[in-house]
Swiss-Prot record:
<keyword id="KW-0479">Metal-binding</keyword>
<dbReference type="GO" id="GO:0000993">
    <property type="term" value="F:RNA polymerase II complex binding"/>
</dbReference>
<keyword id="KW-0507">mRNA processing</keyword>
<dbReference type="GO" id="GO:0005634">
    <property type="term" value="C:nucleus"/>
</dbReference>
<feature type="compositionally biased region" description="Gly residues">
    <location>
        <begin position="59"/>
        <end position="73"/>
    </location>
</feature>
<keyword id="KW-0863">Zinc-finger</keyword>
<comment type="function">
    <text>Core component of the DBIRD complex, a multiprotein complex that acts at the interface between core mRNP particles and RNA polymerase II (RNAPII) and integrates transcript elongation with the regulation of alternative splicing.</text>
</comment>
<feature type="region of interest" description="Disordered">
    <location>
        <begin position="516"/>
        <end position="566"/>
    </location>
</feature>
<comment type="subunit">
    <text>Component of the DBIRD complex.</text>
</comment>
<dbReference type="Pfam" id="PF04988">
    <property type="entry name" value="AKAP95"/>
</dbReference>
<dbReference type="GO" id="GO:0006397">
    <property type="term" value="P:mRNA processing"/>
</dbReference>
<feature type="compositionally biased region" description="Low complexity">
    <location>
        <begin position="156"/>
        <end position="165"/>
    </location>
</feature>
<feature type="region of interest" description="Disordered">
    <location>
        <begin position="145"/>
        <end position="180"/>
    </location>
</feature>
<keyword id="KW-0862">Zinc</keyword>
<feature type="compositionally biased region" description="Acidic residues">
    <location>
        <begin position="527"/>
        <end position="556"/>
    </location>
</feature>
<feature type="region of interest" description="Disordered">
    <location>
        <begin position="19"/>
        <end position="81"/>
    </location>
</feature>
<dbReference type="GO" id="GO:0003677">
    <property type="term" value="F:DNA binding"/>
</dbReference>
Amino acid sequence: MDYGEAEDRDWRFPDTPMHCGVNMPSGSVSDMDRDYGHGGYGGPRSMDSYLNQSYGMESHGGGGGGGGGGGNRFGPYESYDSGSSLGGRDLYRSGYGYNEPEQSRFGGSYGGRFDNSYRNSLDSFGGRNQGGSSWEAPYSRSKLRPGFMEDRGRESYSSYSSFSSPHMKPAPVGSRGRGTPAYPESGFGSRNYDAFGGPSTGRGRGRGHMGDFGGMHRPGIVVDYHNKPSPAAVAARGIKRKMMPQPYNKPGGTFIKKPKMTKPILKLTQKKSSNMKSSFQDSTIEEIEVDTSGAVVIYEDFTRDAYDVGYQTFGDSKGEGKSEEEEKRRIEARREKQRRRREKNSEKYGDGYRMAFTCSFCKFRTFEEKEIESHLESAAHQETLDHIQKQTKFDKVVMEFLHECMVNKFKKTAMRKQQTSNQTENAQAVEKDIMEGVTADDHMMKVETVHCSACSVYVPALHSSVQQHLKSPDHTKGKQAYREQIKRESVLTATSILNNPIVKARYELYVKGENPFEINDQAQEQQTEEEDKAEEPAEGEEEEEEEEEEETEEQTDFTLDHTEDN
């Protein structure tokens, strides 16, 4: 019987649904056996026989064998569509038709013996999906796409023989990378129509083959085990981008910047000679070479002018003048620094800051002459000098000179105090300024305090408070640390004082047996009207002492602020 006659047959559906979710058409037993070829098998068969039949591994014989009753006709479906193979699905649910996934997984329910016309006739029949299935394929079987799970490209568009599954449709040329869906194994059913022949909902380029997730196929997805992608097909992926027109200067896909066309420029070097008028005529021209890439390479000879007559280096005639100017700028910068330091100390400690007697080596400060005199004769001061001599390896003469510098500083401070007029009135004015604006509502009063330099704290001028601070463990630790700090800084102070050029000149006079401080005192007496400028570079040792004192005061302030924060 010609299988094409099935197109003209009147199909009618019985009321009783058949197995596999397919409404089998009514007719004689011989018609069913003849059309579907089940009668030739003779009885129930195992799963392996169906697998071999689906993969074309077993020759199909006795295609039109007749005979057999209803039991023989439906025997194979009973053995195949048992409860275990259906996976617990409702056997009476309509709408699956020939899209049954269990059948599709094993090659489909049609077999491999029928021509394309019979398949098209079954696909064109619209009654098989009358159960209201949402998996309606809008395309006919001849238009379904090929195996999109293999990424085979367009290698099998000319023939339908390679379309092993009825659920595959050739993708259009402008689709997602020639047959590769965006999300082929979507678990949302009809959301992804690309798995059932419909348009793809994804965007962008194909993502290649996605895993089968343990061999569990989603409904409607068919895997073609026959047509695996060949190495040539895999290598051909992405050929669309390679076939795009490339720039003329992109060999092998590597971008090369277009060479910039430049004109050869003759670079002239003029000789730096002031007594040669023909220097412009004798100007040297560098060697210019144009390489193959169009770039200009200039080779300069920087040593050529050095051998010419009248060659003169830059800055030879102005070297001495520049050194003098730099020295002047350095002196002015030092004086400006000293002036700012004096202003800072005056604002911080008051106008009487310069009237204090100090020892730069021991960091001792007092406003009483007796105290400074006793300090200069004390064992603590002598111990500091011995530490300086031990660390610096200075001679005994040098150490005596450093001690005389401190004594001379004390004498000059005493003279400054005597020359200051109205000292008591100025002190009273300062007291008034301190308490200015203070009222009874402010609850403020002036009290005496004792400053501890070791701990950087102010202690009330009370016997109990002072004794309590002396016995505190913080003062014991701070006293030892501060003593070590004084020793370290004393060495730096002595070294900086001796490095001062003015102090060096005084030291030379001191070694000769002269008194260098008397000359400075006489010069200072002539400048009594310029007391504010008395501590300028003429007193080098005092400048260095003030610098060291400022550094120590800054460290003390930092320690005090850190203690208050804690």
